Amino acid sequence: MPKNSPIRSSLILKERRRSVESQIYHLTDRILRLTHHLELHRRDYSSQRGLWQILGKRKRLLVYLSKRNRPRYEDLIGQLSIRGLKIR
């Protein structure tokens, strides 16, 4: 995501930097950058492991946010264009 994107400015200006939403945004940004890196370097297994760790951390934060504040969770996944969690 570019540094001047509207999603970035709305999350950084509205919310505290340490809020769950901004953490999820930054993890999503790192995931997109690592995904692009892995498209170029398919055998970079340490980066693949790092990507899986970041995905797990983002998933845990999304679960936390969905339990604590469902409307903010739905708004965030809409802004970031990511899939929601699977409901069991």
Curated annotation (Swiss-Prot):
The keyword Ribosomal protein applies. Pfam families: Ribosomal_S15 (PF00312). GO terms for cellular component: chloroplast; ribonucleoprotein complex; ribosome. One of its GO terms (molecular function) is structural constituent of ribosome. CDD domains: S15_NS1_EPRS_RNA-bind. One of its GO terms (biological process) is translation. The keyword Phosphoprotein does not apply. Part of the 30S ribosomal subunit. PANTHER family: RIBOSOMAL PROTEIN S15, BACTERIAL AND ORGANELLAR (PTHR23321), SMALL RIBOSOMAL SUBUNIT PROTEIN US15M (PTHR23321:SF26). Belongs to the universal ribosomal protein uS15 family. This is Small ribosomal subunit protein uS15c. It comes from Cycas taitungensis.
